[in-house]
Every structure is written in C-alpha cells, then in structure tokens.
Amino acid sequence: MRFVFLGPPGAGKGTLAGEISGRCGVVHISTGGILRAAIQKQTALGKKVQKVVEVGGLVDDQTVTELVRERVSHEDVVSGFILDGFPRTVTQARCLEDIVPIDYAVSIVVPDDVLVARLTGRRVCSACGSSYHVLFAQPKREGVCDRCRGVLVVREDDKMSAILQRLTAYRAQAEPIVHFYSERGKLVSLNGAPPISDVVLEFQERFAQSR
C-alpha cells in the first residue's frame, strides 16, 4: 500500500514511518533523505539542491517533485511506501496523484502541549542528523550521537518561540492538503499522542483489512 503521512512538527511522522517500515516491509521515503541522497550522489538535481541549501533557501516544488518522482520509480517500492515530508502543498499533492496515486493520507493528530514537550526536548546530531530526546530517546552517552559520535545540539527551530511559529505556519499550510485528501476519501486520522508502540498497533489494526 502507498501512504502519505501528514502531521505537525513533533507529531512523530518519521518515527512512526520507521517503525512501520521495519515491521511491515514498507519503504520509508523521507523528503530530507531524498535531498541528502541527491546531494551526496551529486546528480544534476542534487547539485541544484546543494546550491539552494548552501544559501539557506527553500527547494522549489518542481525540484522536490522530480526527486520524489525518481525515488518512487525504484523497484523497492513495488510493495508500497510511506512518504514523510511530501506533499507540503496542494500542487505537490496533485502532482503526486499523477505520478503514483496513494491509497491513504494518514493525518497524525497530537495536542499542542504534547507537541511542545516533544520538540523542546529534541536533540539532533550536528553531523549525521540522527534525532534523540531528553526524555524518550536518550543517547547512550549524554550529548553524543550513538551512530557517529557527533555532538548533539538543539536546533534553532526547536526553541519555544520558533516552535509556536512553526505550528501556526503548519496549520495554514496543512489545511488545504487535508481538505484535498478528504475530498477524495483518502484521509484517515490517527491519534499520535500515545507511546509509539500504541500508535503502531493502532495503525496496524486500522489497515490490516485493507491489505
């Protein structure tokens, strides 16, 4: 099956997608991962993305869509995939439907107080980007990444003022996309507030009969 995961910052889209991918054999495709891979491989699109990223710009819709188009053409997604971080606009959602129609858009719903608690406690590896949390996913050694031994830092956009701005911006951005999938009967809401193991269980129960 083909899924799109929607949800505000801190909803746990990437964490849930990773868990589902490991348990169900569905490929997890993240926009960030696609961009990093393109830059690392120095493809034509990768070089274009690198120039934008180096000056702190935002990669345009067309470029991101082309990268997604290329990724979902690989053989490993034949049995299904979970898209995390795409689409971010209705234009991208329409393009995705033309490329490969999805089965469900899963909207992960989490109360604001829970989102804030999650985001303010997040720590990210400055070298490889791995994510940790001071309460829920602590590294083996405080302040040091388990994977690459890089230094863990608080991202600027994980500070309180930035978090509140991000949540406001997300709502404005997400409403049209949620409406887009709702109109097509593809929208499913999932409670993302409980522990991840419970959210995974609910996901599996919800979609077991759809396979």
Curated annotation (Swiss-Prot):
<feature type="binding site">
    <location>
        <position position="148"/>
    </location>
    <ligand>
        <name>Zn(2+)</name>
    </ligand>
</feature>
<protein>
    <recommendedName>
        <fullName>Adenylate kinase</fullName>
        <ecNumber>2.7.4.3</ecNumber>
    </recommendedName>
</protein>
<dbReference type="Pfam" id="PF00406">
    <property type="entry name" value="ADK"/>
</dbReference>
<dbReference type="GO" id="GO:0004017">
    <property type="term" value="F:adenylate kinase activity"/>
</dbReference>
<keyword id="KW-0479">Metal-binding</keyword>
<feature type="binding site">
    <location>
        <position position="36"/>
    </location>
    <ligand>
        <name>AMP</name>
    </ligand>
</feature>
<dbReference type="GO" id="GO:0044209">
    <property type="term" value="P:AMP salvage"/>
</dbReference>
<feature type="region of interest" description="NMP">
    <location>
        <begin position="30"/>
        <end position="59"/>
    </location>
</feature>
<feature type="binding site">
    <location>
        <position position="122"/>
    </location>
    <ligand>
        <name>ATP</name>
    </ligand>
</feature>
<feature type="binding site">
    <location>
        <begin position="10"/>
        <end position="15"/>
    </location>
    <ligand>
        <name>ATP</name>
    </ligand>
</feature>
<dbReference type="InterPro" id="IPR006259">
    <property type="entry name" value="Adenyl_kin_sub"/>
</dbReference>
<keyword id="KW-0862">Zinc</keyword>
<feature type="binding site">
    <location>
        <position position="145"/>
    </location>
    <ligand>
        <name>Zn(2+)</name>
    </ligand>
</feature>
<keyword id="KW-0547">Nucleotide-binding</keyword>
<feature type="binding site">
    <location>
        <position position="155"/>
    </location>
    <ligand>
        <name>AMP</name>
    </ligand>
</feature>
<feature type="binding site">
    <location>
        <position position="194"/>
    </location>
    <ligand>
        <name>ATP</name>
    </ligand>
</feature>
<feature type="binding site">
    <location>
        <position position="166"/>
    </location>
    <ligand>
        <name>AMP</name>
    </ligand>
</feature>
<keyword id="KW-0067">ATP-binding</keyword>
<keyword id="KW-0418">Kinase</keyword>
<feature type="binding site">
    <location>
        <begin position="85"/>
        <end position="88"/>
    </location>
    <ligand>
        <name>AMP</name>
    </ligand>
</feature>
<feature type="region of interest" description="LID">
    <location>
        <begin position="121"/>
        <end position="158"/>
    </location>
</feature>
<keyword id="KW-0808">Transferase</keyword>
<dbReference type="InterPro" id="IPR000850">
    <property type="entry name" value="Adenylat/UMP-CMP_kin"/>
</dbReference>
<comment type="similarity">
    <text>Belongs to the adenylate kinase family.</text>
</comment>
<dbReference type="InterPro" id="IPR007862">
    <property type="entry name" value="Adenylate_kinase_lid-dom"/>
</dbReference>
<feature type="binding site">
    <location>
        <begin position="131"/>
        <end position="132"/>
    </location>
    <ligand>
        <name>ATP</name>
    </ligand>
</feature>
<feature type="binding site">
    <location>
        <begin position="57"/>
        <end position="59"/>
    </location>
    <ligand>
        <name>AMP</name>
    </ligand>
</feature>
<keyword id="KW-0963">Cytoplasm</keyword>
<dbReference type="Pfam" id="PF05191">
    <property type="entry name" value="ADK_lid"/>
</dbReference>
<comment type="pathway">
    <text>Purine metabolism; AMP biosynthesis via salvage pathway; AMP from ADP: step 1/1.</text>
</comment>
<comment type="function">
    <text>Catalyzes the reversible transfer of the terminal phosphate group between ATP and AMP. Plays an important role in cellular energy homeostasis and in adenine nucleotide metabolism.</text>
</comment>
<keyword id="KW-0545">Nucleotide biosynthesis</keyword>
<feature type="binding site">
    <location>
        <position position="125"/>
    </location>
    <ligand>
        <name>Zn(2+)</name>
    </ligand>
</feature>
<feature type="binding site">
    <location>
        <position position="128"/>
    </location>
    <ligand>
        <name>Zn(2+)</name>
    </ligand>
</feature>
<dbReference type="InterPro" id="IPR027417">
    <property type="entry name" value="P-loop_NTPase"/>
</dbReference>
<dbReference type="GO" id="GO:0005737">
    <property type="term" value="C:cytoplasm"/>
</dbReference>
<feature type="binding site">
    <location>
        <position position="31"/>
    </location>
    <ligand>
        <name>AMP</name>
    </ligand>
</feature>
<dbReference type="GO" id="GO:0008270">
    <property type="term" value="F:zinc ion binding"/>
</dbReference>
<comment type="subunit">
    <text>Monomer.</text>
</comment>
<dbReference type="GO" id="GO:0005524">
    <property type="term" value="F:ATP binding"/>
</dbReference>
<feature type="binding site">
    <location>
        <position position="92"/>
    </location>
    <ligand>
        <name>AMP</name>
    </ligand>
</feature>
<dbReference type="InterPro" id="IPR033690">
    <property type="entry name" value="Adenylat_kinase_CS"/>
</dbReference>
